[in-house]
Amino acid sequence: MNDSILLGLIGQGLDLSRTPAMHEAEGLAQGRATVYRRIDTLGSRASGQDLKTLLDAALYLGFNGLNITHPYKQAVLPLLDEVSEQATQLGAVNTVVIDATGHTTGHNTDVSGFGRGMEEGLPNAKLDSVVQVGAGGVGNAVAYALVTHGVQKLQVADLDTSRAQALADVINNAVGREAVVGVDARGIEDVIAAADGVVNATPMGMPAHPGTAFDVSCLTKDHWVGDVVYMPIETELLKAARALGCETLDGTRMAIHQAVDAFRLFTGLEPDVSRMRETFLSL
C-alpha cells in the first residue's frame, strides 16, 4: 500500500459532516489508507484554540490537507502561503493543500462543487434571470458559480440588504461585469415569479429550520429550483417544486462535488464521483 493520507476539517459543530467518510472511503478504495479528523473548536479537544494554532499543529503533524468551514473560511486567508485567484476574489477558502515542505495553498471547492452540480443536474436550465435567496454561509460561492455558469442576471435576496449588496459587489468585481444585484428578501416572491429559476442558499429546510425561505405559491412548472440544504435531501422547497413539475437540484450535488474536487487537490488522484456519491448517500 502507498503512503497514507492525513486530512482534517476545522470548524464548529462538525458532528454531522459527511465529508470525513467520503474522503476515507475514497482513499481506501484507491489503495491509500486515509484518516480524516474533525477538528471542532466547540469540542473538548480543540476548544479555545485559535485558527493559527490549529493550522500550525496540522503542519507539524504532517497533514496533507484541511477543509475549512464555518466560521473560519474568511479568517484563514491571511494565514496561508498562497491562495488561488478564485478564492482570493471571493475572500473565502474551504480547502487548504499542504505540500511536503509545509507550503499551504487555499482553494474554494464550494464554487466548483455547486458549478459541477449544476452541469450534472440542470444541464438545460434557462439562465437569463435567477434569484438566490440568502447571502450568508456558502452564498458567495453559489453566486459566483451561478454567474460563471451562464446566469446573465442574478438577484441575491437577503433580510440584511447590505449583506446582499456586499456579496453582489464581490461577485461583480470578480467577474468583471454587473451581473449581480442585492435585494431585500421581503416580498421576493414577485421577483421569483418573473425569474427562470431560484436557489435557496439559506438554512431553511434543515431540521432545525423547518419551512421555506419564501412562499412557494410564486413557483410554476416553468421554474427550476435549487437548494444547498442536503439534510434532508428532499426539503420542503424541493418537495413543493417537484409537485409542480419543476426541474430541481438538491443539495447533495454540491456537497459531493466539493469533496470530489478537494480530494483531487489533496491527493493528486482522480476520484470516482459515483463511488463518493454512494458513500455520501449511505450515511
From Swiss-Prot:
Species per Swiss-Prot/TrEMBL record: Corynebacterium glutamicum (strain ATCC 13032 / DSM 20300 / JCM 1318 / BCRC 11384 / CCUG 27702 / LMG 3730 / NBRC 12168 / NCIMB 10025 / NRRL B-2784 / 534)
UniProt keyword list: Amino-acid biosynthesis, Aromatic amino acid biosynthesis, NAD, Oxidoreductase
Enzyme class at the top of the EC tree: oxidoreductase
NAD in keyword set: yes
UniProt keyword NAD present: yes
Binding residues annotated for L-quinate, in chain numbering: S17, R18, T19, T69, K73, N94, D110, Q258
Function: Involved in the biosynthesis of the chorismate, which leads to the biosynthesis of aromatic amino acids, and plays a key role in the quinate degradation pathway. Catalyzes the NAD(+)-dependent oxidation of both quinate and shikimate to 3-dehydroquinate and 3-dehydroshikimate, respectively. It can only use NAD.
HAMAP family: Shikimate_DH_AroE (MF_00222)
Miscellaneous notes: Has a different substrate and cosubstrate specificities relative to all other known bacterial shikimate/quinate dehydrogenases.
InterPro entries: Aminoacid_DH-like_N_sf, NAD(P)-bd_dom_sf, SDH_C, Shikimate_DH-bd_N, Shikimate_DH_fam
Protein name: Quinate/shikimate dehydrogenase (NAD(+))
Family stated for the protein in its record: Belongs to the shikimate dehydrogenase family.
Listed EC numbers: 1.1.1.-, 1.1.1.24
